[in-house]
Regions:
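Divalent-metal coordination cores built from histidine and acidic residues
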Residues: 1-80, 385-390
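Active-site core of metal-dependent hydrolases
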Residues: 51-191, 196-208, 215-220, 225-231, ...
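N-terminal cationic-hydrophobic initiation segments that often serve targeting/anchoring roles
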Residues: 5-9, 45, 143-146, 178, ...
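Short, solvent-exposed polar/charged micro-motifs at secondary-structure junctions
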Residues: 25-30, 95-96, 118, 163-164, ...
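Active-site microenvironment of metallo-dependent hydrolases
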Residues: 165-181, 185-475
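Residue-level marker for buried hydrophobic side chains located in beta-strands
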Residues: 17, 154, 356-359
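Short coil/turn segments at beta-strand junctions that form active-site/ligand-binding loops
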Residues: 13, 150, 375
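Short, glycine/serine-rich, charged loops/turns that create anion-binding
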Residues: 22, 57, 159, 321, ...
Length: 475
């Protein structure tokens, strides 16, 4: 975090950073590269570039008033800075309790009704562009209000590099909101003045004397074609080209964060120590993004589950050098049968090494490709690497030029589409980086094993021996 703050200083773009509130996102269910407590948060909030506490994802810890989370929230409140939320699925009394803890915004909007309830609860609602399938419904709900409130803002959330280069970030979200029926001037207001209100920055968001001149010049108010960009009063881009030269990095990049040895096919097995051979009923994770438990009867050979033909495998391996537990593997359902493998070190929110596939040999090849690159993502099919892109900076970022990263990512996504069949809106490439987010309700696989975000349990794959005649049922 300190590196990101230092690296942003002096760039021709204003970076407003927030302190990471949930490292890890689900304590006790996963291990991250560090454990942030109140002391670390206090130190980060003291930095002038840090505007507040980043999204508080551990909703359960807030609602149960866990000492760790109460300490983090108290540090943020004492700093006088804003606290961002992650209130996915919260409603009624639970939403009110979450907001009462000092959290004042949410971007995890799941419907139009959800957006309206959170606005009425006094939260700032941040419409995110990463869930495009929800935006038409949310815009329709907003249009039922007598006015567009100042507490309605806009954000991007995750944006992949090829999309960012081709269509842009915030400007693309605004274009889509306008296309879905939001008045252009209201959309622009949400992204400028309203966002400045949210950040408690009265020096931003206005075209007025005495304010900071972070400005864009548009050729029209519907397609929002950007002609010029000014940052802090300086022209930094014109005609879609930078006019200011970027300086070289001032410090060494944080690399070598893949702290694990190469893996073998034997590491990608669902181990069942309760049974050497025979048949067993085991837990599986059904679905993408919004997951639920299922139970599947499988053959067991030498203490390992035999993969049923309609299921696939998911493996998570701790990569930060803080655990000796080894790879954790689970059956996944609802993804179809993988025809290859995909591995990545970019996996919310602890960003351990995550691998998907059906063939342990191909899964090992994909995983080892990522390990050798020092982080990144790789697609394997027919025991050949179809595509890969390196993220050597913390296993999350590339040091290459944006156009190169965009090209590599596009090839990666196209290759991934050859080994798994996408089914929008949930079974998408984006979902591959979110399946480990154990703070959300339902089952997830982390570096500690099968977890339940609703009950905060870590569960074994083995459920029981089957009844006679075999079975398969939802759990």
């Amino acid at each position: 975090v300190r590196y990101a703050v230092r690296a942003s200083r002096g760039l021709p773009l204003r970076f407003i950073v927030q302190a990471s509130s949930c490292v890890p996102a689900a304590p006790g269910l996963e291990l991250s590269g560090a454990d942030f407590q109140a002391d670390e948060i206090t130190e980060l909030l003291a930095l002038p570039e840090v505007a507040g506490l980043a999204e508080v994802m551990d909703m359960r810890a807030v609602l149960e008033a866990s000492p760790r989370m109460m300490g983090i929230l108290a540090a943020a409140i004492a700093s006088g800075k804003i606290i961002e939320g992650h209130a996915r699925g919260l409603s009624g009394e639970r939403l009110q309790a979450y907001a009462a803890a000092g959290i004042s915004a949410d971007h995890e909007i799941v419907s139009g009704a959800d957006a309206l309830e959170k606005l009425r609860a006094g939260l700032t609602v941040e419409l995110r562009g990463s869930h495009d399938y929800l935006l038409p419904e949310v815009v329709a709900a907003i249009r039922t209000l007598p006015v567009v409130p100042t507490s309605l803002t806009v954000c991007t959330d995750d944006v992949f590099p090829d999309y960012l280069v081709e269509k842009g970030g915030m400007i693309d979200v605004l274009r889509r909101l306008i296309r879905y029926g939001l008045d252009p001037l209201q959309a622009i207001r949400c992204a400028t003045i309203n966002n400045a209100y949210r950040l408690r920055r009265d020096d931003l968001g206005w075209v007025a004397a005495g304010r900071r001149a972070d400005l864009i010049v548009l050729t029209d108010l519907r397609e929002l074609q950007v002609e010029q960009v000014y940052a802090n009063g300086r022209l930094v881009a014109s005609g879609a080209r930078m006019v200011e030269t970027l300086r070289a990095p001032l410090q060494a990049l944080p690399t070598r964060t893949m702290k694990l040895t190469e893996l073998s096919p034997a590491d990608f097995a669902v181990r069942l120590p309760e049974l050497a051979d025979g048949r067993a009923v085991v837990r599986a994770i059904r679905g993408a993004r919004f997951t639920e438990w299922s139970e599947v009867e499988v053959d067991v050979i030498e203490g390992a589950a035999v993969l049923p033909p309609e299921l696939s495998l998911m493996t998570v391996v701790h990569r930060h050098g803080r655990s000796q537990l080894g790879p954790q593997t689970a059956l996944i359902e609802g993804w179809g049968r993988w025809r290859g493998a995909y591995a990545t070190s970019y996996a919310h929110d602890s960003h351990n090494l995550v691998v998907y596939g059906a063939d342990p040999v191909e899964m090992a090849l994909a995983a080892n490709t990522v390990i050798r690159m020092g982080g990144g993502a790789a697609v394997v099919r027919d025991q050949q690497v179809l595509a890969s892109t390196a993220f050597p900076v913390a296993g999350l970022l590339s040091a290459a030029e944006p156009m190169q990263v965009a090209r590599e990512h596009r090839v990666l996504v196209e290759a991934a589409g050859e080994v798994v069949e996408w089914q929008a809106p949930y079974r998408t490439f984006k979902a591959l980086s979110g399946q480990c987010l154990a703070c959300n309700a339902g089952p997830h696989l982390t570096d500690l094993g099968l977890t339940d975000g609703s009950t905060r349990e870590i569960l074994k794959p083995f459920v029981r021996l089957p009844v006679s005649g075999g079975e398969r049922r939802a759990g």
